[in-house]
């Protein structure tokens, strides 16, 4: 399921590069070996917070 969001995360990377990173971002950055990560949150379904790991 997380993998499905990976492509979406990459698309949001450039536009949200200035957004701050969270601890979860760092964890996903190591998992995906990517500079862009998916933030873990518990909002309503379909809502995702994106950010870039530096």
Curated annotation (Swiss-Prot):
It comes from the Eukaryota. There are 3 tandem-duplicated genes coding for this protein in S.cerevisiae (YLR156W, YLR159W and YLR161W). Additionally, a fourth copy has been disrupted by a Ty1 retrotransposon, which led to the prediction of the 2 dubious ORFs YLR157W-D and YLR157W-E. This is Putative uncharacterized protein YLR157W-E. It comes from Saccharomyces cerevisiae (strain ATCC 204508 / S288c).
């Amino acid at each position: 399921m997380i993998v499905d969001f990976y492509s979406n995360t990459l698309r949001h990377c450039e536009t949200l590069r200035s957004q701050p990173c969270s601890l979860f971002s760092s964890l996903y950055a190591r998992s995906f070996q990517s500079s862009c990560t998916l933030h873990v949150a518990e909002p309503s379904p379909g809502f995702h917070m994106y950010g870039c790991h530096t």
